[in-house]
Amino acid sequence: QHWSLCHAPG
């Protein structure tokens, strides 16, 4: 399961 590069909280 990969996340998007801009999936960081903020």
Swiss-Prot record:
Family: Belongs to the GnRH family.
Assembly notes: Homodimer; disulfide-linked.
InterPro entries with a match to the protein in the record: GnRH (IPR002012)
UniProt name for this protein: Gonadoliberin-2
Keyword Disulfide bond belongs to the record: yes
Its job: Stimulates the secretion of gonadotropins; it stimulates the secretion of both luteinizing and follicle-stimulating hormones.
The organism of origin for this protein: Chelyosoma productum (Solitary ascidian)
Modified residues (Pyrrolidone carboxylic acid): Q1
Glycine amide: modified positions: G10
Compartments where found: Secreted
Keywords: Amidation, Disulfide bond, Hormone, Pyrrolidone carboxylic acid, Secreted
Keyword Secreted (UniProt): yes
GO CC term, one of those recorded: extracellular region
Main location (coarse class): secreted
GO molecular function terms noted in the UniProt entry: hormone activity
Distribution of this protein across tissues and organs: GNRH neurons lie within blood sinuses close to the gonoducts and gonads in both juveniles and adults, implying that the neuropeptide is released into the bloodstream.
